[in-house]
Amino acid sequence: MRGAGGPRGPRGPAKMLLLLALACASPFPEEVPGPGAAGGGTGGARPLNVALVFSGPAYAAEAARLGPAVAAAVRSPGLDVRPVALVLNGSDPRSLVLQLCDLLSGLRVHGVVFEDDSRAPAVAPILDFLSAQTSLPIVAVHGGAALVLTPKEKGSTFLQLGSSTEQQLQVIFEVLEEYDWTSFVAVTTRAPGHRAFLSYIEVLTDGSLVGWEHRGALTLDPGAGEAVLGAQLRSVSAQIRLLFCAREEAEPVFRAAEEAGLTGPGYVWFMVGPQLAGGGGSGVPGEPLLLPGGAPLPAGLFAVRSAGWRDDLARRVAAGVAVVARGAQALLRDYGFLPELGHDCRAQNRTHRGESLHRYFMNITWDNRDYSFNEDGFLVNPSLVVISLTRDRTWEVVGSWEQQTLRLKYPLWSRYGRFLQPVDDTQHLTVATLEERPFVIVEPADPISGTCIRDSVPCRSQLNRTHSPPPDAPRPEKRCCKGFCIDILKRLAHTIGFSYDLYLVTNGKHGKKIDGVWNGMIGEVFYQRADMAIGSLTINEERSEIVDFSVPFVETGISVMVARSNGTVSPSAFLEPYSPAVWVMMFVMCLTVVAVTVFIFEYLSPVGYNRSLATGKRPGGSTFTIGKSIWLLWALVFNNSVPVENPRGTTSKIMVLVWAFFAVIFLASYTANLAAFMIQEEYVDTVSGLSDRKFQRPQEQYPPLKFGTVPNGSTEKNIRSNYPDMHSYMVRYNQPRVEEALTQLKAGKLDAFIYDAAVLNYMARKDEGCKLVTIGSGKVFATTGYGIALHKGSRWKRPIDLALLQFLGDDEIEMLERLWLSGICHNDKIEVMSSKLDIDNMAGVFYMLLVAMGLSLLVFAWEHLVYWRLRHCLGPTHRMDFLLAFSRGMYSCCSAEAAPPPAKPPPPPQPLPSPAYPAARPPPGPAPFVPRERAAADRWRRAKGTGPPGGAALADGFHRYYGPIEPQGLGLGEARAAPRGAAGRPLSPPTTQPPQKPPPSYFAIVREQEPAEPPAGAFPGFPSPPAPPAAAAAAVGPPLCRLAFEDESPPAPSRWPRSDPESQPLLGGGAGGPSAGAPTAPPPRRAAPPPCAYLDLEPSPSDSEDSESLGGASLGGLEPWWFADFPYPYAERLGPPPGRYWSVDKLGGWRAGSWDYLPPRGGPAWHCRHCASLELLPPPRHLSCSHDGLDGGWWAPPPPPWAAGPPPRRRARCGCPRPHPHRPRASHRAPAAAPHHHRHRRAAGGWDLPPPAPTSRSLEDLSSCPRAAPTRRLTGPSRHARRCPHAAHWGPPLPTASHRRHRGGDLGTRRGSAHFSSLESEV
């Protein structure tokens, strides 16, 4: 090898001068070639003298014959190697130095090869000193004492073929890491190099990724005695001990350890240093190794030696001579000659010359081995072996170290067997396995540390049973195994107490018999290459004939896996949440049946709509039909805000409430289940088993179904035995491994994969994207299990069965299944959530409807019983008045309307002016369409901007009673009262309101469609009043008021015959009227009624403050008129009837007048009592008070100037007319005869009234007009009073305050209040 400072380099001249000086100083200058004599100068080989020094008498016999053998073994081009053997007898360091110096001074040598028996630990420092002093290369071929050399002398060329202490520790720590022996203690004596030993340990543990547990260092004194040494060794509890000591010190240390019980099974000793060479043997295999005192070494001792520790002496010496020869050859190639080195130990130190020569020995190769040395003189890549002392005290190679890689023979002690127990053939098992996730998972070792993680077990792909494999033999590849079955194996080894060696089968199969030969794991057990086989090994009949199986630890079978295919949303996906049976049951059965049930209950209810038809009171009115019932139930199901008509009967309402609850459940279930069907559906094929037609006849499908399995397994065996046609078809689609089959499924090249259920379920749960699914949520066919295969009649079967049953009982198997067999994909939940709801799921709500129908029948019967029988037994009560007052008070508190201003004191009485009729208005135009709710609110609030004639006091009383709500039927007039002057005349004519559309039919008393008003004179026998002149209309007060009128009869031409105007002069154009002779025009229709003022002649304490709200002036401004024999109080009232009608107690509760205004009389005030109605009776059923029917004590103003006939005369009685005995009750047509003015007999304390003709549903049970004898007195809550202050009476009769106070016996007023409250809640 050419160095950097060759002759042609920049330092060539300086080196040439150095070489010339050395040549001149040499004692043999004639043999040194010149600079140009490369290759031998004269053509001959240059002689190379190498001294072979043996220290010890053991080498005396062999030293004489080593020279020729070494010279023949080492041949170097251009050099003539001449070994010279010398034997040193002295063993002490002084004798060794003197002998070496004398030898070197008498010989011309170029190098020294040293061999010793390591009895002199100080040999290495002496050799290192001599090399530095003389610049001679010295090679120690046996190691021995050279291992303790540290640090090295400067300029020394002392080389060692053995390994250093640091290199030995590196190999030892690899062994500890391989077996997970991480806890250890260092034991040393004070031998040379012990400090370096401890420092090397600190360096290796601190910089490692392994969690080493260094429990300390013990420094022993071998001369202290065994008791002291034993106590020191027991002071640290560690089963792994690293010992560094001299050979003579090892005997007392091991004796003390044996006495302390720290040797033998359970404890491992690693020895570092030259202590094991020589002594009781030369290391030859089979020869017992003894300590110097004859004591044997403990079994299980580990040591690290050089790879040539078993080579003979000639080979070891030849290796050292070859190192010197290769270095001299490189030096000769660079300089052309071999320099003479120093031979005088007492001469001056030549350190600079040694530094320049050392580099020629850095890269040397001989016999295909690397002998390159580092700066410390040790081999860079030594070949080392790990040896272990067996029970028969022989050394066995258990591992090798080459190229920084450790290879061990497995097992020494099983990692998961009894800890550190020596290998016992009777308790050691060879276990075969096969990779298949998740049962056996094979991974490479850690690339950084080269070891397996703690939850895995080392396993080999090839088992090597030889003790010392040849160098060219294939070595097993180190792998790491983990998984479900590996965890079971570890628990079995710990519970039963055996060690094991785990390896992977070479053919990668479970086991199948091919040409009479079994392969796979079954073949390994059957041919006794393995003691046990564990993995995903299915138990079947064919395998059970040749091997024994343990009890199954995993239940499995055959399953089918497919891939999800993307689909589209079906057009009928919105119907998928329910099955067809549920839809039919819902809309055909339930909706129809419940609708008919509600209709029947409503039709037969005492308060239902059919009541008007049955009694003939409301012909042509609103009815609750089957169509409306179905529409109501349909709207409740889908929660639509559509106009509906609600039933009024209690039974019908209960049924509707139950249906609403049913609709909530039905709609909520539909909404919750709809999302699973509206998403993009994924198609998953389904089969019933291996006998399904899709597997047995795949060609009949288009495209044909492609399915397969993994051959040579139990699945294929089952299919081949039971379904041969199916097996012959699927052979073309079989896959070599499970992973490849899953890839084919995802790629669409395979439609179905048949395999073990346990493996497929795990793969489906662990699949990325959850695209793979087992058919039927893991449905298993041909159920079986996984077991452990053993030899026939194996003694391990019973212990393994008992241990597995214990694991099953302790739920350890279940815990392992959750750990290894679970995943993130859960197909079961998805299928359950997307299933249709059938009749069984919705049976509860249908049963609820049936029960509700049964309960409704009971309520229906009770309702009729109460209405027809029990209600007549109930007496009057004040509870309803209290509840009504409380309800109205709560409404007033919750109302946002401002409180009305306080009432003003009543003004003094003023004379009433003569009434005047306003001019007729043209017919109203068509009313614009207004929604029902908005129209109702507008009609309620229209009167807020107007007030009654006579001032604000009238409105204050109205607002105090009703709160913010003002019904249209009681509107405060079309215009406010005009301010009056001093004469009491109005200053301007009143304003009118725009026409209003009739209200919709919210309640029973609201008309759906109003017929046209009959024209003037339509009623025979009732003359129409003469129309006042237009000029007088402007000066007269506000129009008169009347009771609300409701008529649902056909139009006037078909209902009332038109009378002769001459016989009815008051209907327009009579002789006595101001408009006589004028053509009769159709009267204009009114959109809203005029304001009405009512008086209560029997005030109650609750109405006392309302009684003072109006004075005489206010009453004077009312100017009402009442014509005794005409249903319309004045001519202008021929407009349209009002759109709202109110109950009697509402009308009677609002008083526009004052009790104090009545003119004083000497006696008690006379009352005008009669039966009041919500609507004006059609003629002749009307309430009237004739002029001559007034009491003589009443004050009456003069009649109007346009009134015809004699002046009115006073009458003593006023009452309700008795129905005509010959006129049917259902008829509304008036006869042509003159009106009947009934006279009633006055009794003490009251008036005897004839029975009335009820015309309204609210008054059908009015008890104020008894149907008994005429002598029955009108008393109690049915008394109604009306004061008639004018000669023509004040106005239509109204109920009194007593009717509000006593409502218990008046069903009509209770209904009217309920209707009024319902309308209040709507608005």
UniProtKB/Swiss-Prot annotation:
Keywords: Calcium, Cell membrane, Disulfide bond, Glycoprotein, Ion channel, Ion transport, Ligand-gated ion channel, Magnesium, Membrane, Methylation, Phosphoprotein, Postsynaptic cell membrane, Receptor, Signal, Synapse, Transmembrane, Transmembrane helix, Transport
All ranges on the Extracellular side of the membrane: 28-579, 672-840
Biased composition (Basic residues): 1208-1228
GO BP of this protein: adult locomotory behavior; calcium ion transmembrane import into cytosol; cellular response to L-glutamate; ionotropic glutamate receptor signaling pathway; monoatomic cation transmembrane transport; positive regulation of excitatory postsynaptic potential; positive regulation of synaptic transmission, glutamatergic; regulation of monoatomic cation transmembrane transport
Site (Functional determinant of NMDA receptors): N639
Keyword Coiled coil attributed: no
Modified residues (Omega-N-methylarginine): R1303
Region (Pore-forming): 628-647
UniProt-listed CDD domains: PBP1_iGluR_NMDA_NR2, PBP2_iGluR_NMDA_Nr2
Main localization, broad class: membrane
GO molecular function annotation: glutamate binding; glutamate-gated calcium ion channel activity; ligand-gated monoatomic ion channel activity involved in regulation of presynaptic membrane potential; NMDA glutamate receptor activity; transmitter-gated monoatomic ion channel activity involved in regulation of postsynaptic membrane potential; voltage-gated monoatomic cation channel activity
List of residues binding L-glutamate: S536, T538, R543, S714, T715, D756
Protein name: Glutamate receptor ionotropic, NMDA 2D
Species of provenance: Mus musculus
